[in-house]
Amino acid sequence: MAFDFKKEYKELYQPKDKPGIVTVPPANYIAVRGKGDPNELDGAYQRAVSVLYAVAYTLKMSHKSDRRIEGFFEYVVPPLEGFWRQEGVSGVDYSDKSSFCWISVIRLPDFVAGEDFEWAVRTASQKKKLDCSAAEFLTIDEGMCVQAMHTGTFDSEPETVSKMDRFLRENGYENDISDNRLHHEIYLSDPNKTAPDKLRTVIRHPIRKSDPNQAGGN
């Protein structure tokens, strides 16, 4: 049976609706960076997703090509994920999606080395007639985070984020979102096949322990 990240790492891909704390180990990803409204038809985000899947499936099917990847085993392509921030916005303003800056990613199995990745980018570009040069091999070390399963539309995410923030305050933690540690979403549902109110999205935020001295001084 093919290895499935969602089943093997349930603590990362199948959290409960109730917020919880998780330490996320470093992982390698196919990544494409960009900016703009993710809903724009044929926009930068949708093009990035096409590149990600082209490279991801080239690697997945490499055992049926002349390429031999050391340590390869059959696996299910992991779900699409995204790291998000907004320029010039305090918090999140869902009414201004054009200001979103994002890193769209798909996780890589550990056996994929840099040269294997470069081969997949070249091969996908040639076979799919798609410019995949924007794809990069990216290692992300998220560390300590709070996460929860959000069920519903993307625009209703603030409800789940509010629950996460309340959980942090009640347990002595605070958000540690910065240019290097970003709001993270993992998309477990196909929006083309799932009703908006049934979409399942993992929401994850980087955190740190609160400073009691700082809190007491305010």
Describe the role of every protein-language-model region:
Residues 1-218:
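A solvent-exposed interaction/effector surface
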